Amino acid sequence: MAEDSSIISHVSLGANHFERAVGFYDAVMASLACSRIMEHPGAVSWGRGFPEFWVQTPINGAAASQGNGSHISFVAASKAQVQQFWDAALAAGAQPDGEPGPREEYGKAYYGCFVRDLDGHKIEATYWDQSLA
């Protein structure tokens, strides 16, 4: 996937236990070769060159909650990186929500996995094998 192929600038998730969430995402983002890009009081971002993914305390002071039917997928560079994401997420406390593997209902090129982060947000790592598309 080309670096400029995304239509998304960035995504933010709310966290009820900010420091725990930052520790979780430090491990998960490292598995995808992403690093911390920016930090502000109550907010941290990760990416591969610009702040693509943020975790923050909700600005309105209310509790963070999950969106029913919503999830975020991170681009993996290989099937092995999908597995690394899975392993890192589970080791950091995520709940499994779909083991790594192909899902032909999403297309022959799809390979990915799903987990629930510490606040219950559904996150995914996806590898798109162009040779199978």
Where are these predicted regions, by residue range?
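N-terminal beta-strand motif that seeds the catalytic metal site of vicinal oxygen chelate
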Residues: 1-22, 129-133
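Long, continuous compositionally biased terminal/linker segments
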Residues: 2, 47-88
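Conserved catalytic-core motifs of GNAT/GCN5-like acyltransferases
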Residues: 12, 35-38, 101-103, 127-132
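Core segments of cupin and vicinal oxygen chelate
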Residues: 12-53
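Vicinal oxygen chelate
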Residues: 15-20, 74-118
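Short beta-strand micro-motifs in enzyme catalytic cores
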Residues: 42-44, 70, 109-113
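Short beta->alpha transition motifs characteristic of CBS
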Residues: 107-108, 114, 125-132
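Glycine-rich acetyl-CoA-binding "A-motif" of GNAT/NAT acetyltransferases
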Residues: 122
